[in-house]
Amino acid sequence: MDEIRVTILTASYNRAKLLPTIYKSLQRQTDQCFEWIIVDDGSQDDTALVVKAMQESHKVEGFPITYLYKENGGKHTAINLGVKAANGLLTLVLDSDDELPEDAVHSVWTCFEQIRENERIGGVCGYMAHRDGRMIGRYVSDGLIDADTRQLQYQYNVDW
């Protein structure tokens, strides 16, 4: 395992049935220099068992999977706990009903490498798509955009 450059952080509440889909999309990543932290926000389903099964089947190689449990307090508290446990230089929040295209970790890291010395930039984001590949929202640019949230909304007409 190479160094952990990216932490993929998933807050989960009663999403045991959805977590294997994320896991499969993470297994397909072309860049495996990441960890996956799952923060269980007080689930009452089989989340702990599902994560344990994924951890057991994944022991030999690949990215580490960390499971943290906390009493229900809302997604924001789960994210905060996960960030404290993160080992990556970057943190990518991946919702429990999402999945990533196979080059996502590589793409995010490549973008970060281009801007990492710029202290004005605090994050990297990209397009979202439906599972069938249709883009959510509208196309803005082929290249990088240096903009704050107001510019994205009013100059580039990006809806949140």
Regions found by a protein language model. Give the residues of each.
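Nucleotide-sugar donor-binding/catalytic module of glycosyltransferases
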Residues: 1-160
